[in-house]
Swiss-Prot record:
It comes from Burkholderia multivorans (strain ATCC 17616 / 249). This is Glutamate--tRNA ligase. ATP binds at residue 246. Residues 121-131 have a biased composition (Basic and acidic residues). GO terms for molecular function: ATP binding; glutamate-tRNA ligase activity; tRNA binding; zinc ion binding. Its EC number is 6.1.1.17. CDD domains: GluRS_core (cd00808).
């Protein structure tokens, strides 16, 4: 009988989490949801010096923002130390592990000799018990590490869902340290115990873990477990072709939220960053879960493309509910010194959003465009001199008079503009540009009739007339 699917995301909380990291959560999440399975969040915090609560909070916040809900967890490795020590004791008792008293200095010297002889640097098994072998006397006062007794012959093989068949000779692997002298278990050991105890059936992770896999499989089999299905994802590269990392300028996941990206756009973009469903570029979260499979994971490194993300985000902004966008825009407006009182005194924010969103790539851009409706304009003096010339002033005066009498609708405003243009033999930019500057403070706006219709009539007329006084 096939076991129910159980996947996991197992980040180390040692820094911020970027798009390359969170992709290793998205795919196992999607696979678990597709297969009606269980998605486990495990925090691998055994690196006590580098781990932090702030990094854990960033992981949880990023997952919540993207909607990557987990069924079990977060499970912290540091809270499972008793279990690891229990398994270590069992391994010692069964001869699956042994104490090794070789010091770091001795190991370094051994490796130097091996390199000089043209050999691969590796532990030579000095303290490995064998039938008939006489072990050295343990040095006094030295606490040993524990090493896993790796098979000496045969191969470790697995059918990777991304890389295909992988085979590693056991002769290539030395006896891995699985516990430090103070008894603290090592990462590769903890991972195996966790995956076994948690019944993980599919491990979907970055291919920087490929070299760990044969060691983990050997430990797992020694403990009587069966390896999960492995899918090692190729690296995510930045736009310069380097591995995505904080050092190479990667943004944290939450920085995308703070820059005005929508979570559905980021999920859609991440989904395509190493997986495909035919030529589909835009799809909902529900479609992604329905379509996701391991067979269509990419085999080559995926390169981050900021313009592609912007294109997707612009699409989702156009599709988004105006009330939702208004709520998202408020913090950005507040950062522009536009408070609730200013918003209440101006046009309905949702109506402004409806006008501005088709021109925006991010919610931040929407807010920057919307700001003109809620502040007193301060047009550039050079722009005023260029556009509000003596030649256009009579047309501006006639337009102000026409707007006083017109119905306050986009259509009526458009008619007033066209009538003024015809009467003064002007082209639209000759009139629209100065009106934009005087009313909104900028020449960059959507259609002038739509913009004016959102302002209060008295505001529009008074701002035009003030420039003519």
């Amino acid at each position: 009988m096939t076991r129910p699917v159980r996947t996991r995301f197992a980040p180390s909380p040692t820094g911020f989490i970027h798009l390359g990291n969170i992709r290793s959560a998205l795919y196992p999440w999607a696979f678990a949801r597709k297969m009606k399975g269980t998605f486990v969040l495990r925090i691998e915090d055994t690196d006590v010096e580098r781990s932090s609560k702030e990094a854990v909070d960033a992981i949880l916040e990023g997952m919540e923002w993207l909607g990557l809900d987990f069924d079990e967890g977060p499970i912290y490795q540091m809270q499972r130390m008793d279990r690891y020590r229990e398994v270590l004791a069992q391994m010692l008792e069964k001869g699956l592990a042994y104490p090794c008293y070789m010091s770091a200095e001795e190991l370094d010297a051994l490796r130097e000799r091996q390199r000089a002889a043209g050999l691969k640097p590796r532990y030579d098994g000095t303290w490995r018990p064998e039938p008939g072998k006489v072990l050295p006397e343990p040095p006094p006062g030295v606490k040993p590490v524990l090493r896993f007794r790796n098979p000496l012959t045969g191969t470790v093989a697995w059918d990777d869902a991304v890389k295909g068949r992988v085979e590693i000779s056991n002769e290539e692997l030395d006896d891995l340290v699985i516990a430090r002298p103070d008894g603290t278990p090592i990462y590769n050991f903890c991972v195996v115990v966790d995956d076994m105890d948690m019944g993980i059936t599919h491990v979907i992770r970055g291919d920087d873990h490929v070299n760990n896999t044969p060691r983990q499989i050997n430990i797992l089999r020694a403990l009587g477990g069966e390896p999960p299905v492995y899918a090692h994802l190729p690296t995510v590269l930045n736009e310069q072709g380097e591995k995505m990392s904080k050092r190479h300028g990667a943004m944290s996941v939450m920085a995308y939220r703070d820059a005005g990206y929508l979570p559905e756009a980021v999920v859609n973009y991440l989904a395509r960053l190493g997986w495909s469903h035919g030529d589909a570029e835009i799809f909902s979260r529900e479609q992604f879960v329905e379509w996701f499979d391991l067979e269509h994971l990419g085999k080559s490194p995926a390169q981050y493309d900021h313009n592609k993300l912007n294109w997707l985000n612009a699409h989702y902004i156009k599709e988004a509910d105006n009330a939702r966008l208004a709520a998202l825009a408020k913090p950005f407006l507040a950062a522009l010194a536009i408070d609730d009182a200013a918003l209440a005194a101006g046009p309905a924010l949702e109506a402004v959003i409806a006008l501005m969103k088709d021109r925006a790539t991010t919610v931040k851009e929407i807010a920057e465009g919307a700001a003109m409706f809620y502040r007193v304009p301060a047009p550039d003096a050079d722009a005023l001199a260029q556009h509000v010339s003596d030649a256009v002033r009579p047309a501006l005066a006639d337009l102000a008079a026409a707007l006083k009498a017109a119905d306050w609708t986009k259509e009526a405003i458009s008619a007033a503009l066209k009538a003024t243009l015809a009467a003064h033999k002007l082209k639209m930019p000759q009139l629209a540009m100065p009106v934009r500057l005087l009313v909104a403070g900028t020449t960059h706006t959507p259609s002038i009739d739509a913009v004016l219709a959102l302002f209060d009539r008295d505001v529009v007329v008074s701002r035009i007339e003030a420039a003519l006084a």
